[in-house]
Every structure is written in structure tokens, then in C-alpha cells.
Amino acid sequence: MKVLNFGSLNLDYVYAMDEFVQPGETRACLGRQVHCGGKGLNQSIAMARAGLPVWHAGILGAEGGILRETLTAAGVQTEFLRQSEAPGGHTVIQVDRHGQNSILLYPGTNAALTEDFVDAVLSAFGPGDVVLLQNEINLVSYIMRRAAERGLAIAFNASPFNGVEDYPLELVRWLFVNEIEGGALSGETEPEAILRALRARFPKTEVILTLGSDGSMWAGEGGSSFCPACRVQAVDTTGAGDTFTGYFLRGILGEDCGLDPLTLATRASAIAVTRPGAASSVPALPEVLAFRNGK
């Protein structure tokens, strides 16, 4: 089994703020850091640090050499990365004193995938393999359909949410949504109702619903389960959801590690929020297995 991630590759410009800048306001920041990121890159690193065999596919911008190096250092295979001289993807992130974030995204070369490139990459994968997607790249619908034709199982993190309703979500095996995304897809507001509605609409899809500090839920053919969030002091929540996604898939696809997928993902994301940055905050599997609530 191999995991292919058609995923975004960004440089994250992170600004520490006492409070978020409001419309019409100019405010000096308390500090600035530059990190490797993008939901795709973060999730590839999370899966690799969790022990899954991961191949990342995407297009690097002119300044993207450090992104390739970061993936390689984490154990991600990078033979399906292509280089472009066009501007790459980047984000401008505000992080307030509570560790909450506000993110402005410029897609850059993440929106430059071509059908020929997608087909060439998918030709190296087949039945028994998994493709992971997020919504920070173009051609998501095309990749879903072509991957399904080749017998790959599809995992999809429906973030950012724009255009998601038009995708062939019935092809997705594992759908990751937060409360806002799940509510928009289902027309419901309560977590249990969101899960019921999405399972009724997509009966072949397992739905993973993240609830922030309230925990997470997972619904599939065997019913539903809930895992409360771990109580930790958050420093930066930027990479928490990506860490959760990568470790949940490790729980599903990897060897038994003694923790169910929801608990494994919850512990990993709890560790991630205690550290600054996105990709740099992702823990390795031994650390997650040794973690206890808040410790």
C-alpha cells in the first residue's frame, strides 16, 4: 500500500499578534517567522512521521527548494514534484495571544496542475493504494474521478470549502470536515445531525468531523464514535487539523499501534498545537504513543 498526496506546498509567513488586525486598522506585530506549510505538505509530513509510505505530488514555485528539502527530511518521497519559475503558494498568518490563527492564502503554483501531469503521476499507483486530497489545489474533481477509475481509495480534507459541493464526493472513502464545512454540506448544525445527514447522502463514505476544543467524531458503517480533545496549552493551532488528518489515516492504514484512529489523531494534534509553526510542529509516532492527556 502506498499513499499519494496531491497536495499544496506553501511558505507560511507567520505574524505574532496580541489581537487580530481589524478592518481599517494598522497594527505592529510582535514577531515574524517563516515556516514551510500548505495543507498538503503538512499532511504528507504527518503521515510520514506516523510511519506511512508517502509520495507527494505537486508543483513548486521559484522559491520552493526548501519545501522539497523539508519533505525529503521527513521521509516523504518527492519524485513527483515538478519545479516552476512562477510564484509559489504562500500564506500570511496572524497568530493571537491565545494561539488562534487567521490565514490569507495565495495559491500560486498550487493551482497550476495539468491533466497530463495528474495522469502521469496516477499511472504509478493502482488498487490497494490511497490518494489524499485537500482543496488548496486545482483539478480536484478530475483527480478524484481518475483515481477512482484506477482503483485507489480517496481521502479528502474539504478545506478550504469553496467549490466542494460540486465535487464527486460519492467517490470519497474518508471525508474530513470541521463543523462549518460539515454544516454547509449537510444543512445541519448539530454534530450528530451533520454526521447522519452526510452518511445518508454518501453511504459509502466514512465521515470524520472535527469539533475544535470539543473533540472529534467518526461515523461509518459500524456506527459512530467520539473522542474528547486533550487539554493542553495552545501556542499555535495552524497545523493541528493537518496533523489530525495524517495521523487518522495512519490509524486506518497502518499496523495496529494500540490506539484507535480517532484517539491517535487527537493526541498527535494536541502535541502539535503546543508548538509554533505548521509542518515543524508535527510530532513523530513514538512521541504520540507516549503522550498522555496534557503530558
Residue ranges and their predicted role:
Residues 48, 148, 253:
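Gly/Ala-rich phosphate-binding loop of Rossmann-like dinucleotide-binding domains
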Residues 47, 178, 241:
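Short, conserved phosphate/pyrophosphate- and ester-handling motifs at nucleotide-, phospho-/glycolipid
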Residues 163, 192-295:
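Conserved phosphate-binding/catalytic region of the ribokinase-like
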Residues 1-9, 69-83, 93-226:
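Ribokinase/PfkB-type carbohydrate-kinase core domain
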Residues 1-23:
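Positively charged, low-complexity intrinsically disordered leader regions
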Residues 2-3, 23-90, 291-294:
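Substrate-binding N-lobe of the ribokinase-like
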Residues 21-31, 224-233:
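Glycine/charged-rich beta-loop-alpha catalytic/anionic-binding loops adjacent to active sites
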Residues 43, 142-145, 268:
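Aromatic/hydrophobic pocket-lining residues that form π-stacking "cages" and hydrophobic walls in ligand
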